[in-house]
Amino acid sequence: MPAYRSRTTTHGRNMAGARGLWRATGMKDSDFGKPIIAVVNSFTQFVPGHVHLKDLGQLVAREIEAAGGVAKEFNTIAVDDGIAMGHDGMLYSLPSREIIADSVEYMVNAHCADAMVCISNCDKITPGMLMAALRLNIPAVFVSGGPMEAGKVVLHGKTHALDLVDAMVAAADDKVSDEDVQIIERSACPTCGSCSGMFTANSMNCLTEALGLSLPGNGSTLATHADRKRLFVEAGHLIVDLARRYYEQEDERVLPRNIATKQAFENAMALDIAMGGSTNTVLHILAAAYEGEIDFTMDDIDRLSRKVPCLSKVAPAKADVHMEDVHRAGGIMSILGELDKGGLINRDCPTVHAETLGDAIDRWDITRTSSDTVRKFFRAAPGGIPTQVAFSQEARWDELDTDRENGVIRSVEHPFSKDGGLAVLKGNIALDGCIVKTAGVDESILKFSGPARVFESQDAAVKGILANEIKAGDVVVIRYEGPKGGPGMQEMLYPTSYLKSKGLGKACALITDGRFSGGTSGLSIGHVSPEAANGGTIGLVREGDMIDIDIPNRTISLRVDEAELAARRTEQDAKGWKPVEQRKRRVTTALKAYAAFATSADRGAVRDLGDR
C-alpha cells in the first residue's frame, strides 16, 4: 500500500521541526495522518478569467476539510493573452505555461502534498496545470473558473452578441465610428470568466472533461451562474475520496496517467476537432502527452482529423454562438454523446467522477438522460448583468436546445461539415506539419494559391496590413515567431483581425511559425514546423513565391523546385537562421532560457533537455 506522501513531513521524531511549522499554519494533532490536499489556485486581478477566483480556493478548502482532508492553498501566475496581445508582452505567454507547470511541481513536491485540486481558467493556466498533473501523477481534479457571458449590444436598431475579437476588429475598421467602437468595447466583455467564444481557455477547459479529469459542465457552465458553485463543492469532496482510494485502497485507477491515457487523449482530440477548438489546444495536448510519457503525436491528430466531423461552430467560427449556447445544447457531454453515437470515441476510459466516460455520457447527455436535475443544470443561462462576482445569478433558459439537425450541436448525420474543425497540413514548407482551424475557414478558400508577402515579425506584418500593402489573393508569411525564434511563439490575433477589418478575411491566407489566438478565424495556418529559427523551409520563402494550400487534401507547398531551395538553404546557412534586420524586441534572460530548450510546435513547444 503506498504511504501518504505527506507522512514524509508529518511523521517521526526527526520531523518535529516540520510539524512545528505545519502547526503554525493551523494544523492540529488530529490533522496529522489525514491526506494533505494542495489547492492550486490562480487568482489574479490582472485577468477577467481569474479575477473571481480569490475566495474559490477557500471554498474548495472548506469542502476538503469537511470531507476529512487537510487543505493548503497556493497560487500560480496567470498571463492574460488578450492584454499581452500585440506587444512584447506576448513573448511571455507560452513560456508562462512551463513556469506554471514547474511552480506546481515545486510546491507540491517540496511540501509532499498527497493530491491536488487545480483551479484554472485561462489560456496557459489550464495547460500548465495539466502538464504538472501528468508529471506528478498524484490524484488530481480540475475545476475552472468558467466562461464569461457573451456581450450584448444594440447597434443601429439591431442586437448583436459580442466578444473580445469584435472589439479588436471594430477598432481597426475605419468604417466603424469612434462612438460605435466605444459601445462595442464597453459591451464585449461584460462579466468575469474566460472570453465567451471557443477560444483557447474554453477549449482547454472543455478538453479536461474529455480527458476525464474534471466534472461535467466544467467547460461550459458560466462563471456567473450559481450552478457553477456545485463544481467547486463537489471537487473538494471528490479529491479526498480519490486520495483515500489510492493511498488506502491501492486503487491506481485514480491516478492522472491511468485516467488520461492515450485513448483519453484521442477522445479529447476528437472533441477538439468536432467543436472546432483553438489551434493552441494542439500545442497543449502534445505538451501534456509529453509530460505523461504518452505516445500521442501530430500523426494521431492528423488521423483523427480525417474521420471526425465538425459538430459545433462557436465564435469566432460562428459569430452569434458562444459558450452559453453550447451549455444550453447540453455542453461537452452532449458533443461527446454525438461522437459516441458515431462510434468516434473510446467509451471505456475512466474518469474522476464516473467508472467510465460512457457511463458519464449516459447520465449527462441531454438527449439520453432521464435526470431532471441534469436537464435543469444545462438550462443555466446568462444573467445579462455586468459583474466580477462568481455564482451571482440563477437565470434559466425556458427550454434546452436539443435540435441535432440545425442546432448549436449537430449529430454525425447532420454535421456542419464532414471534415472536422481542425486539420494538419504537410508539405515542403512544413515538413513536420502545421495546423489550421478549418471551422473558421470559408468554404470558398479551402483551396488557395497566392504570392507570398514575407514579414520577419508580427509587428512588421501589422504595419504592412494597416498600410494597405496586402491585397486580395496574397499569402501573408510571418516567420521567426516560433518558440525559439520569437522567442515565445506569439499569437497573431492582431494581424488576422486587421485582415478582417480590411475586408480580406475571406480573400487572403496567413501562414506562420507562430501561433494564433483561439479568437482567430479565416485561412490562418500556424505552428509551421520546423520553425524558421530551426532551419525550416518557411525561412527560405521569398517575396512573390507562390504558395499552394489544399485543406481537403491536407497539403501546403512552396512552388519552388528542390534545386533552388537547396541553393537558398546553403545561402541561409552561411547567414544564420535569423531575421534579416534587428528587431526592436527586448529578449530577457528568462526568454533566452526558454528559447535555449524550446522545441518546434509539432512537439508541443516543450523543453528538450536531451533526456528523451
From Swiss-Prot:
Enzyme class: lyase
Active site: S517 (proton acceptor)
Domain of life: Bacteria
Tagged with keyword ATP-binding: no
Gene Ontology CC, one term: cytosol
Modification type N6-carboxylysine: residues: K124
Binding site for Mg(2+): D81, D123, K124, E491
Residues annotated for [2Fe-2S] cluster binding in this entry: C122, C195
Keywords: 2Fe-2S, Amino-acid biosynthesis, Branched-chain amino acid biosynthesis, Iron, Iron-sulfur, Lyase, Magnesium, Metal-binding
GO terms of biological process kind: isoleucine biosynthetic process; L-valine biosynthetic process
Pathway assigned to this chain's UniProt record: Amino-acid biosynthesis; L-isoleucine biosynthesis; L-isoleucine from 2-oxobutanoate: step 3/4; Amino-acid biosynthesis; L-valine biosynthesis; L-valine from pyruvate: step 3/4
Gene3D superfamilies: IlvD/EDD C-terminal domain-like
Enzyme Commission code: 4.2.1.9
GO MF term list: 2 iron, 2 sulfur cluster binding; dihydroxy-acid dehydratase activity; magnesium ion binding
Note on how the cofactor is bound: Binds 1 [2Fe-2S] cluster per subunit. This cluster acts as a Lewis acid cofactor.
Cofactor(s) required, per the database record: [2Fe-2S] cluster; Mg(2+)
Pfam families (UniProt xref): ILV_EDD_C (PF24877), ILVD_EDD_N (PF00920)
Entry-linked HAMAP family: IlvD (MF_00012)
Primary role: Functions in the biosynthesis of branched-chain amino acids. Catalyzes the dehydration of (2R,3R)-2,3-dihydroxy-3-methylpentanoate (2,3-dihydroxy-3-methylvalerate) into 2-oxo-3-methylpentanoate (2-oxo-3-methylvalerate) and of (2R)-2,3-dihydroxy-3-methylbutanoate (2,3-dihydroxyisovalerate) into 2-oxo-3-methylbutanoate (2-oxoisovalerate), the penultimate precursor to L-isoleucine and L-valine, respectively.
Family: Belongs to the IlvD/Edd family.
PANTHER family: D-XYLONATE DEHYDRATASE (PTHR43661), D-XYLONATE DEHYDRATASE YAGF-RELATED (PTHR43661:SF3)
Protein name per its UniProtKB record: Dihydroxy-acid dehydratase
Annotated source species: Rhizobium meliloti (strain 1021)
Gene: ilvD
